[in-house]
């Protein structure tokens, strides 16, 4: 009997010891971020070892990412208001991800009169390079022998040009018998095949990247009457659609919502067109995305796009997205301290991104937004080390590529490391720099 009791006590001691070890391993601060649904599968969670948070583990801090859309992510960070992540979320907003860049007005307001006056300057830097794909569900059969592959088990693809994109997304073209094949210069079909258009109803950086291109290439000739696209996080805004969206348009919230709507329309045999990041499409474009690799996951067929400037057809691969962003360089010197210089929102660089000279036409970067100063030194260190891994660790790059994205160009990686992950640039922009944060000035968030 005594022996049994002794064994029970030993087992309990081992259990308690194990619990203590687990708690010690996860003893770091809670780090909260959120926003872009585009990067959500890449950033992931502790429970997914094939994601960035899964790779990072919990020894320095426990990261949680909330996929709520770029607009909500921006608002959460700028106001340090975690309820933008969800009604029951409390605590500090340490970072946000947004496919749409912050405007000059947003940055100025934050740094001059907003939380930046106590939290310290915000940092906005490119996180990944992405294409925005155009899924085409129940589209006419692919007859081309030259367009690039975009979909598993399908050697070629439906091709669309700017006139097609402007027509479909404005409501001018509502049937596949109106959509002109760029290769043959004839309609894709003579049969009636009405098209549903699925768009994001929430504040979406994916929408912003699409509308940036549409605003650059759509004209009164290729767009529905009264529709004028603007670069916006809101697709169905009153400037673009003063009379509301057409009857064939279907609203969906978040990338998962768009994919869900497409799945329903696919099952119903209804033709549909939408826009999504690669990680919500198929395994040809995103071979490791948790969204598309599960057993029986729908593999969405994707269009290739015709670049009118170099007259080539491109699949929305990460290599073609990087080709599209071209030779844009990272800011240096005093310009490095301006968050709007890291992601162009105006000028020639912006125009080059909106309608690129080569590569996949609807491409850009998704950004991470964070504070230079954190009041909790351990939180600041965890954020710093997570970012350092993202930009320099090959395992993290593999996760990025596996989700259909590219890492930022090497010149940006070097500039980010020398300005924000160290002070080798001597610009004093690095996270929790002692001359700027804490005793140096800003208390931090």
Q: PLM ranges: what are they?
A:
Residues 1-25:
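Gram-negative bacterial Sec-dependent N-terminal signal peptides
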Residues 26-445:
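Flexible loop/hinge segments at secondary-structure junctions
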């Amino acid at each position: 009997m005594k022996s049994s009791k002794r064994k029970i006590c030993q087992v309990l001691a081992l259990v308690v010891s194990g619990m203590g070890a687990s708690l010690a391993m996860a003893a770091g601060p809670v780090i909260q971020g959120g926003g872009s649904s585009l990067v959500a599968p890449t950033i992931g969670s502790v429970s997914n070892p094939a994601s960035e948070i899964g790779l990072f583990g919990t020894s320095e801090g426990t990261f949680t990412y909330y996929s709520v859309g770029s607009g909500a992510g921006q608002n959460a960070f700028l106001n340090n208001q975690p309820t933008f992540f969800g009604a029951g979320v409390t605590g500090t907003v340490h970072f946000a991800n947004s496919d749409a860049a912050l405007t000059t007005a947003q940055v100025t307001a934050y740094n001059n009169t907003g939380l930046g006056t106590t939290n310290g300057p915000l940092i906005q830097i490119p996180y990944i390079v992405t294409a925005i794909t155009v899924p085409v569900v129940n589209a006419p059969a692919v007859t081309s022998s030259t367009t690039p592959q975009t979909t598993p088990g399908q050697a070629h693809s439906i091709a669309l040009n700017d006139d097609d994109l402007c027509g479909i997304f404005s409501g001018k073209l509502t049937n596949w018998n109106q959509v002109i094949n760029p290769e043959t210069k004839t309609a894709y079909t003579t049969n009636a095949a009405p098209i549903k258009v699925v768009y994001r109803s929430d504040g979406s950086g994916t929408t912003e990247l699409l509308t940036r291109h549409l605003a650059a290439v759509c004209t009164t000739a290729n767009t529905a009457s009264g529709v004028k696209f603007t670069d916006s996080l809101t697709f169905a805004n009153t400037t673009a659609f003063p009379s509301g969206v057409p009857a064939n348009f279907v609203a969906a919230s978040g990338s998962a919502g768009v994919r869900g709507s497409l799945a329903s329309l696919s099952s119903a045999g209804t033709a549909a067109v939408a826009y999504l990041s690669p990680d919500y499409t198929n395994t040809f474009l995103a071979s490791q995305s948790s969204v598309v690799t599960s057993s029986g996951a729908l593999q969405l067929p994707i269009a290739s796009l015709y670049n009118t400037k170099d007259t080539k057809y491109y699949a929305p691969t990460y290599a073609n997205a990087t080709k599209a962003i071209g030779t844009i360089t990272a800011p240096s010197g005093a310009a490095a301290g301006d968050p709007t210089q890291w992601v162009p929102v105006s000028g020639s660089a912006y125009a080059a991104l909106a309608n690129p000279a080569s590569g996949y036409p609807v491409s850009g970067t998704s950004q991470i937004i964070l504070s230079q100063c954190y009041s909790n030194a351990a939180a600041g260190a965890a954020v710093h080390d997570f970012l350092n891994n993202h930009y320099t660790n090959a395992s993290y790059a593999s996760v990025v590529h596996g989700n259909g994205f590219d890492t930022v160009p090497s010149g940006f990686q070097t500039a980010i490391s020398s300005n924000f992950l160290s002070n080798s640039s001597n610009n004093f922009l690095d996270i929790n720099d002692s001359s700027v944060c804490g005793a140096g000035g800003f208390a931090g968030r």
